[in-house]
Amino acid sequence: TVFQKGAPLEGRLYDLEKERIAKHLRSNGYAYFYSNSFAELDADTTESQKKTTLYLEVIPPPGESSHQRYTLGNITIYSQFDATLPDSIYRDTVVNGFLFKLREPVFLVRPQTILNAVHLQTGDIYSQDSYDRSLQHLSSLGVFRFVRIRLDADKDDASVLHVRIELTQNKKYELGFDLDANYIDGYTLTGRGSLMGLAFSPTAQNRNLFKGAELNITSLNAGVEVNFSKLNTNAFWNSVELGLQNELYFPKFVDYLYLWRGMNKLPFGKKKLVSDALYQVLQDKAASRLSARYNYVFNFGWYETSLLNASFGYDVPIDNNTRIVLDHVGIDYLRPVTQPAFDTILMANPFLARSFGKQLFVSLFFREFNLSKQRRPNRYGESGFNNLNIEMAGAEIWAGNALYNAFALSQDTLRISGTDFSQYVRIEWDTRYFKEYTPNLGFAARFNVGLARAFGFSTDVPYVKQFFVGGPNSIRGWAARGLGPGGYRDTLSEGLTNRLLFYQTGDLKLEFNAELRFHVFSRLKGAIFLDAGNVWTLRPDADRCGSQFLLSRRMSENCPVNLPFNDPFYKQIAVGTGAGFRLDFKYFIFRLDLGVPLRYPRPVRNLMDTSPSEADYWHDFSNWRLRDVNFNFGLGYPF
């Protein structure tokens, strides 16, 4: 009970208590018992003015002396239901005691798949929990457009409820596509440069591949990026990307190596390592997923990469607002091929050379965990979103390698064809807040923090797993990967041959974004934004002075073109601002954001001064020119 002896009496507690009791009774046979079955709360204060005795009175149904407790009778399943057709056209088929009504001569969905999602049984006491689980489980199969469960009273026995399950088939095949575009316009020391990217991603879905409600999704990705500033030169084509991915979902929980069953039986203090409630959620709601992907990127004149990926895991919709994605097994093979121009960059940037080579990511028990939670708008117009991602690779290989070395008394590192196994852990948290003041005025904010760390035999986190900032969906005053790490200044990115090729990344990321969004007229909307953040390295990097995340200033050595010191992280926060325009066509949004740097992560004046003033970090607007603006074009909102 929500009432506690000695606690203050509140009226709202009575409503909660009525709902609690009604829910409990509906799950114990009383199918039609609701909170309105109670009379007004009766409080007796005759014994004391400061204490009261509460009485809850149950009102019987009209014309009855008590509420009826029900058992379940016949269960009939219309697996190909059509409300426009009479019952007479359906064929009867009995499977495991359940009566199926079919329009077609064969089952479109295997009956056992349907029965696995039905948690009601003839002869059982009616349970609202079992009713809700069945409704939710059948809906989650994805092969039914509509799911309805009716309860009909028996004509001869008032204590029996017959169950009628109506399943309307969904379309088996579905085609769709996504279009993504981005545009970045900015300056380097060589003058203005502009990159335009366009990507097309068609998708084909089969909702019942093997007649067991399996969902197969095949996606193709094709993208190209061009440099308009080099229109009549060989440098016009910047990059090409091609990708193919296939995901196969099974509508059941496949316990990988019986790990979850074992953890459910393993004691953990006074409880279990995996609770019965969590194990039940996995069995009821988890869809098992097999995924394979190939991705190819060719950056003209610089490098090309090929990525192969395969994984196995689960997709678990906890409720309408919460989803968990868990991968047990993950295998990635990354193979880069560099051109002489990029080899020059690698020679000048050992950090990039160490993290850009061939990579093999292998996880056998745990690869990735992703938790996303949506917060629906409240009465104040506030809503939100949270996402936590944890990724790890190589732990099992490293442990096995270390165990072998201990027994063999050696220091060998396991490799395949000269390719090292990467060991790293990566954590990222993203939280967003939205506030709607009026239908034409709103506020949006995002905070993002990420941390990546190599362990085992790896010294650096793979380049593709490191963090970066800048670009249309990040700190819009800088190009993607053109900011940081820390106060480091990348002179190579300002070289005469650079085609807006930025590659600066870090092990730690802090980022904050805020937008005031408003309606202009018709389909045109506007925004004023503020972005702040940076990326850092966790360890000192002799090749990127000023890049380390520190709490206090430390002097640097051998940094002729950079700062003679490494500032604390809060002095290296870059700040940008700007305004944007959005054309809202409901199904997609064209966005143009004009970003301007406000504060740099290092002094831009008096560079070699060991005690620069705060003003030395800020942009000088006395000589403001159009070249100071970064033009960012994209589809959809940045967050």
Which residue stretches match the model-derived regions?
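C-terminal outer-membrane beta-barrel translocator/porin domains of Gram-negative envelope proteins
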Residues: 100, 182-193, 323-519, 528-567, ...
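Gram-negative/organellar outer-membrane beta-barrel architecture
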Residues: 4-7, 107, 127-387, 476-477, ...
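Interaction-mediating elements
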Residues: 1-140
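Membrane-embedded beta-strand positions of outer-membrane beta-barrel proteins
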Residues: 177-179, 216-220, 290-292, 386-390, ...
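Extended hydrophobic-aromatic, low-complexity segments
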Residues: 147, 174-177, 187, 212-215, ...
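Beta-rich nucleic-acid/ligand-interaction surfaces
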Residues: 40-54, 153-165, 447-448, 452-454
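C-terminal beta-signal and terminal closure region of outer-membrane beta-barrel proteins
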Residues: 469-472, 476-477, 542-639
